[in-house]
């Protein structure tokens, strides 16, 4: 497994290689680069596919200190530079979209285009935060219960999602790391008023049944980014790229063509 020493982190990544146009896949909260296996398989013949584990996730390991999605965006841009890639299409699911938008704002030279999957530019409804915080507190204190595991599975993948492999990973997450990565989520800034500054071509893909981020948030993002296109995945949940890979891949392929 390759690693890159970047910004004080030991970033784990996968790279299909070659000198083809690059796609950089950034995963969602509590996930890792393997959530894009279906996309890497579909696109690696025509594109150089890089998928990476963000701070506090997967092979990159626990976050060493508090961080923001601007830090994650800087990690992504630095990873491209480490690999000798000047520009990539940033494909981001949920928090991967958060960092992709911030990369487009802070390092537009590195962002050829953006694909937002189950993501948003604005904030979560305030009434959601106490529930999420209580869940994190219970999880970090008592471990991953059956109830919490089932709740997370439903939020991420919907009722048909097989979350067993992910539960095994979640059970290994430390209490300190859980609080750190959720703090990053809770304290992020609202980008709504900055969307008009984004110049990269943008595709917004969102499921009708996303339990984490309602479709209206994707619609707002698509309306705010100049020229953005919205594709709605019928029956898709939060991680539609996993549960509805075929229509998601079709939307991405048509956007990239």
Question: Where do the PLM segments sit?
Answer:
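Conserved alpha/beta-hydrolase catalytic His-Asp/Glu region
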Residues: 124-130, 142-196
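Catalytic histidine-centered segment of alpha/beta-hydrolase-like enzymes
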Residues: 236-245, 249
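Catalytic histidine neighborhood in serine/cysteine hydrolases
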Residues: 219-239
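Flexible "cap/lid" loop of the alpha/beta hydrolase fold
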Residues: 98-106, 110-141
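Conserved acidic catalytic loop of the alpha/beta-hydrolase fold
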Residues: 70-88
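Short beta-strand/loop motif that positions the catalytic acidic residue
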Residues: 198, 204-206, 210
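Conserved alpha/beta-hydrolase "acid-adjacent" motif
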Residues: 211-217
């Amino acid at each position: 497994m390759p690693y890159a020493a970047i910004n004080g982190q030991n970033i784990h990544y996968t790279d299909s290689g070659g000198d083809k146009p690059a796609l950089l896949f950034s995963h969602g909260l509590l996930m890792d680069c393997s959530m894009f296996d279906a996309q890497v398989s579909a696109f690696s013949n025509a594109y150089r596919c890089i998928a990476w584990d963000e701070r506090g996730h997967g092979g990159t390991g626990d976050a060493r200190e508090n961080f923001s999605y601007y830090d994650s965006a800087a990690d992504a841009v630095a990873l491209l530079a480490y690999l000798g890639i000047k520009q990539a299409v940033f494909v981001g699911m949920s928090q991967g979209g958060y960092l992709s938008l911030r990369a487009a704002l802070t390092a537009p030279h590195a962002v050829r285009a953006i694909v937002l999957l189950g993501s948003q530019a604005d904030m979560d409804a305030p009434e959601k935060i106490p529930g999420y915080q209580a869940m994190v507190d219970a999880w970090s204190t008592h471990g991953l219960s059956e109830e919490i595991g089932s709740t997370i599975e439903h939020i991420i993948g919907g009722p048909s999602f097989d979350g067993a492999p992910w539960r095994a990973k979640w059970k290994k997450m430390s209490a300190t790391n859980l609080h750190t990565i959720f703090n990053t989520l809770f304290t992020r800034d609202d980008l709504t008023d900055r969307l008009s500054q984004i110049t990269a071509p943008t595709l917004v893909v969102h499921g009708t049944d996303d339990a984490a981020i309602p479709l209206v948030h994707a619609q707002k993002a698509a309306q705010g980014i100049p020229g953005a296109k919205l594709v709605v995945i019928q029956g898709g949940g939060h991680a539609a790229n996993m549960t509805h890979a075929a229509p998601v891949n079709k939307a991405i392929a048509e956007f990239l063509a």
